[in-house]
């Protein structure tokens, strides 16, 4: 793949966000360009924002240590710098739904690790080996949200994604 997609992590300082950081390091398809988190972390370097809470077994990648964390609630600022975001925020479900829809409405696709939209009828919950065709619902979601490019797709929970392929 020649093009690398510019991606952001919304909820970058939490444990799931940290995991996304490690997974995206040196990824051939994705270039991590934005780290976003709560207002408490905004304006700090990623290293300072996370501090001693780094929970991964590998050291924090050098490539992200000095990146400035953006405020995840400043949707337009984040969305303007990426092709899409991975969402790993830790907040009440109604707030997650509103935030993810705000990103989608800003024409920024959202790949969510959260459960907030898992039962939203026009949001695909994708296990690629099993139901990749479920992305066909995205045009209906875009119509509801009034978007051309923005949408939300969610992953299943970790237990489900591990045993569904074997059952299929």
Can you name each region flagged by the protein language model?
Residues 1-168:
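N-terminal Rossmann-like NAD(P) cofactor-binding subdomain of oxidoreductases
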